[in-house]
Amino acid sequence: MSSSNKNWPSMFKSKPCNNNHHHQHEIDTPSYMHYSNCNLSSSFSSDRIPDPKPRWNPKPEQIRILESIFNSGTINPPREEIQRIRIRLQEYGQIGDANVFYWFQNRKSRAKHKLRVHHKSPKMSKKDKTVIPSTDADHCFGFVNQETGLYPVQNNELVVTEPAGFLFPVHNDPSAAQSAFGFGDFVVPVVTEEGMAFSTVNNGVNLETNENFDKIPAINLYGGDGNGGGNCFPPLTVPLTINQSQEKRDVGLSGGEDVGDNVYPVRMTVFINEMPIEVVSGLFNVKAAFGNDAVLINSFGQPILTDEFGVTYQPLQNGAIYYLI
């Protein structure tokens, strides 16, 4: 029993693959035959893929010629010039006009990128100095110069601006030990209106007091606003007036002319036991300042050599760090 195509559901119907086969062909041939023929013909046509063009692999000779042309100033060659370049490069290998054109475009883009990167990275000047303001000591002594390692001493109430008498006696005074105060073995001197003096009591640097000591306002050794905040030590200033009766070796001065009253040699700041102290530049008398048994070492742990009187062979370095043992 057979039935015509017009009685089939629409989902099985398909259009003819060729316009020459008209309605009469549909009646004679079932629709599924047309469907299979269409698929077969389309599958055969899809297999006909054109061969890909070979990729251009430039030869070293071709690259050298292109670079020389680009460096000579030819950045965007016209079509006629591209053809002449292509003919010249064909001697070393296969190449097309499009390859030449795109090479110049890419070369121009790379040159612009290199120039842009060069302008965005300026060179550091040798005169620039690096300052590290991150340590706790910077809040007291200012910034630290990385090249010299010096701590600039700021203005402080403890810095003596007027002449004052300053002695380095080498005798033991019990009253000085009672008025001295400090940190461990290192005792801090106090600047008074009558001057200040050091003595060697218990191998520490102590104070000789007078009757006006109670009139001196309290000194904030920890910096800050005076309310106990902070942990910084203000720089101590050694007055520079030299007593004429004191020997030159006792005040840390080397030979030369006699030193009289009201003589102000050059001052410098050194750090002894992490505290800044201003001393006279030149040779320093360790025994006169800190006692007969005192030994001064540098930041490398090497002792500072002195003669039999305690005078250093070399002057102390400005801004250097020393330790008293």
UniProtKB/Swiss-Prot annotation:
DNA-binding region(s), residue ranges: 51-115
Record bears the keyword Repressor: no
Compartments, record wording: Nucleus
Pfam families: Homeodomain
Gene Ontology cellular-component terms listed: nucleus
Expression across tissues: Expressed only in the egg cell. Not detected in the pollen tube. Expressed in the zygote, the basal cell, and later the suspensor. Expressed in all suspensor cells, except the hypophysis, and in the embryo surrounding region (ESR) endosperm cells. Strongly expressed in the suspensor cells, with a weak expression also detected throughout the developing embryo.
GO molecular function: DNA binding; DNA-binding transcription factor activity
Induction per the UniProt record: Up-regulated in the zygote after fertilization by the transcription factor WRKY2. Up-regulated by CLE8.
Keywords, alphabetical: Developmental protein, DNA-binding, Homeobox, Nucleus, Transcription, Transcription regulation
SMART domains named among the record's database cross-references: HOX
Gene3D superfamilies linked to this entry: Homeodomain-like
Purpose of the protein: Probable transcription factor, which may be involved in embryonic patterning. May be required for basal embryo development after fertilization. Acts partially redundantly with STIP in promoting embryonic cell division and proliferation. Promotes cotyledon boundary formation by maintaining the symmetry in CUC genes expression domains.
UniProt cross-references to PANTHER family, sorted A to Z: WUSCHEL-RELATED HOMEOBOX 8, WUSCHEL-RELATED HOMEOBOX 9
Family: Belongs to the WUS homeobox family.
Protein name: WUSCHEL-related homeobox 8
Organism lineage string: Eukaryota, Viridiplantae, Streptophyta, Embryophyta, Tracheophyta
